């Protein structure tokens, strides 16, 4: 029999490799009323496992010293350890983890009773949220445990993190697929039942539904299968229906029981759908323009004669007045001048449709020649390799 219902390590070798790569490793095991210990040097046991006392405790202490013969650097980065241990505490509600760095007399205690709901709260700190955190746990018939927490905020990015047996999957997998399917179905059903889609005359996609969403998906699977040794994508087919069914049931009930939250989420989705459509139209307009169109506009781009981007320079100047002075003093062969009027938009905080509808930003995009958007952006088409 296995010692644990579920378990997980990065490569499935755990302490064996730690032992092999350590100059010294010391084990202390508290079990069945006795204290056992064993020590290894460079992977070789120094003596058999022995009993050194009695105890009422249970657990294992592992101490190891990385080998300087193997590693060029043996100094631990406390920030990396803190990030991972905090993550583990969120994923295992009620487990208390203490991190001490005796080099600088530092101690962190991680103890989150709320589990994934506190994980979402931590990620969304400082953001304006649209709903209270939705959080549930469920057990499927095949031994798979599902836990999900989510919340929408007023940002425009999706932030979904997936875990299997406490191991992160940056490429998602079947648990993410099940989550997305249930989320989209639940929201579409709500929008149809409330007659919102007909009223607003918009078509909604899964991307619209996930704009501003922060979510954590954690599954515990007895025998998980991954796409590679590093476990960056879960491929266990039985996980998708387990997550989808649990999420569908719980999330649909949440929307019915929390009408104000559902209304806020629906408003966010409709705004995202409209913005996506406006961005598409604006992108098509920008695509139809060329640098020659802009060159013909008064007070806009004064291009250089050089056609080789590596030898061309673009100077961005504020206003037509500065633009006129710059044009008089430039080297026409290799220096282009682009005057920009008014207060430029902070594109980091602006929604995509607002950014692309800005005349000054549109002028800049067209002048640079790289295009815009995931499908069309190509840095190889940059018309100037020096931009000032």
Curated annotation (Swiss-Prot):
It holds the Pfam family DNA_gyraseB. The keyword Cytoplasm applies. Disulfide bonds: none annotated. One of its GO terms (molecular function) is DNA binding. Keywords: ATP-binding, Cytoplasm, DNA-binding, Isomerase, Nucleotide-binding, Topoisomerase. SUPFAM superfamilies: ATPase domain of HSP90 chaperone/DNA topoisomerase II/histidine kinase (SSF55874), Ribosomal protein S5 domain 2-like (SSF54211), Type II DNA topoisomerase (SSF56719). It comes from the Bacteria. GO terms for cellular component: cytoplasm. It catalyses: ATP-dependent breakage, passage and rejoining of double-stranded DNA. This is DNA gyrase subunit B. It comes from Acinetobacter baumannii. The lineage of its organism: Bacteria, Pseudomonadati, Pseudomonadota, Gammaproteobacteria, Moraxellales.
């Amino acid at each position: 029999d296995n010692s644990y219902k579920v378990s997980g390590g990065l490569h499935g070798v755990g302490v064996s490799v730690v032992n092999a790569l350590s100059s010294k490793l010391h084990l202390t095991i508290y079990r069945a009323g006795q204290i056992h210990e064993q020590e290894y040097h460079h992977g070789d046991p120094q003596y058999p496992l022995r009993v050194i006392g009695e105890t009422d405790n249970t657990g294992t202490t592992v101490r190891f010293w990385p080998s300087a013969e193997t590693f060029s650097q043996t100094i631990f980065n406390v920030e990396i350890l803190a990030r991972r241990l905090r993550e583990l505490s969120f994923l295992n509600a009620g487990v208390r983890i203490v991190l001490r760095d005796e080099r600088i007399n530092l101690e962190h205690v991680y103890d989150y009773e709320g589990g994934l709901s506190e994980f979402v709260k931590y990620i969304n700190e400082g953001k304006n949220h649209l709903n209270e955190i939705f959080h549930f746990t469920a057990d499927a018939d095949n031994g798979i445990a599902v836990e999900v927490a989510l919340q929408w905020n007023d940002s425009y990015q999706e932030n979904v993190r997936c875990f299997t047996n406490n191991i992160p999957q940056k490429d998602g997998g079947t648990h993410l697929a099940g989550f997305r399917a249930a989320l989209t179905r639940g929201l579409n059903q709500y929008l149809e039942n409330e007659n919102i889609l007909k009223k607003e005359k918009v078509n909604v996609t899964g991307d619209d539904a996930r704009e501003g969403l922060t979510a954590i998906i954690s599954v515990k699977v007895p025998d998980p299968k991954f796409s590679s040794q590093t476990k960056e994508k879960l491929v266990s087919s039985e996980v998708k229906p387990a997550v989808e069914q649990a999420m569908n049931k719980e999330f649909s009930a949440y929307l019915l029981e929390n009408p104000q939250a559902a209304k806020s989420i629906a408003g966010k989705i409709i705004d995202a759908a409209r913005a996506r459509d406006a961005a598409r139209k604006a992108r098509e307009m920008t695509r139809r323009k060329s640098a020659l169109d802009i060159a013909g506009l008064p007070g806009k781009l004064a291009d250089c004669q050089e056609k080789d981007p590596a030898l061309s320079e673009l100077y961005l100047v504020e206003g037509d007045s500065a633009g006129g002075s710059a044009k008089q003093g430039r080297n026409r062969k290799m220096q282009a001048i682009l005057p920009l009027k008014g207060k430029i938009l902070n594109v980091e905080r602006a929604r995509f449709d607002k950014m692309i509808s800005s005349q000054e930003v549109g002028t800049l995009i067209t002048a640079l020649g790289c295009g815009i958007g995931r499908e069309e952006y190509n840095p190889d088409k940059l018309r100037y390799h020096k931009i000032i």
